[in-house]
Amino acid sequence: MATATLDKAALSRLFTDYSLEITPKDVEALENAAHMIPPGTLISVTFLPGAEYEDRARAAKRIQELGFRPVPHLSARRLIDEADLRTYLDMLKGVIDLKHVFVIAGDPNEPLGIYEDALALIDSGILKEYGIEHCGISGYPEGHPDITDEKLAKAMHDKVASLKRQGIDYSIMTQFGFDAEPVLEWLKQIRSEGIDGPVRIGLAGPASIKTLLRFAARCGVGTSAKVVKKYGLSITSLIGSAGPDPVIEDLTPVLGPEHGQVHLHFYPFGGLVKTNEWIVNFKGKQGI
């Protein structure tokens, strides 16, 4: 697929301060990709089942050692109680300069402990107590398969209000998607409602079509025939791979002041090295 030529200033703004995400198992891949990543880049550490606190803390420590800024995830429904949360935060403070976290409800349908959702954890006041200065929260431009749009909107406003009361800066990181249109509509909507914090638009790094469609199905991301064709995917053929070029090409010309501060967040489903090679090559082709 040919790369469209985009406005350099607009594209440069979009790529400024982009962020990445890793699992605790990706430390070696991060070391291999580190030379391609700008110093100070925000790199999230997921809170998924199958990893221990020590594994997550070790990954966060390595991120900082490599010159990047670690953003540990806190999955509210996977935490048993306050002591459990403090155990992890204490462990993190012992190995990194803990200033930035990302709080999400998490995937269990029923909480494993006392935190019903992300708001419950934020409202606890523990983040402020531990010196957290910035908290990321989730955004869903295409909605959530298990939560109504009304509940999603209320939850976002409640979390933003709680963080502002506590003097903690916030940003919103969105679910990944293949279509720019719902992202743009959602941005206009939240800005009109007074949500003024930075937004990190989630994009899937280059990956096999099979992998992208699997993650889309798991996350409730739209894969209509029109959307997947434009993205370079095929529902009938799982051969080949695709990258986020089409979404960026659609976003860049139309993002304006009414959309607020916008950055990119890459989910490296096809591998961290592959994602960063794509970023370097894309920026090189565009001359930014």
Curated annotation (Swiss-Prot):
UniProt note: phenotype after gene disruption: Mutant cannot grow on vanillate or syringate as the sole source of carbon. Mutant retains vanillate and syringate O-demethylation activity, but accumulates methyl-tetrahydrofolate as a result of the THF-dependent O-demethylation of those compounds.
Pathway info: One-carbon metabolism; tetrahydrofolate interconversion; Amino-acid biosynthesis; L-methionine biosynthesis via de novo pathway
The entry's keywords: FAD, Flavoprotein, NAD, Oxidoreductase
Cofactor: FAD
Gene3D superfamilies named among the record's database cross-references: 3.20.20.220
Chain residues that bind (6S)-5-methyl-5,6,7,8-tetrahydrofolate: D107, Q175
Binding site for NADH: Q175
GO molecular function terms listed in the Swiss-Prot or TrEMBL record: FAD binding; methylenetetrahydrofolate reductase (NADH) activity
Keyword Flavoprotein: yes
One Gene Ontology biological process: tetrahydrofolate interconversion
Protein name: 5,10-methylenetetrahydrofolate reductase
Organism: Sphingobium sp. (strain NBRC 103272 / SYK-6)
Name of the gene encoding the protein in the UniProt record: metF
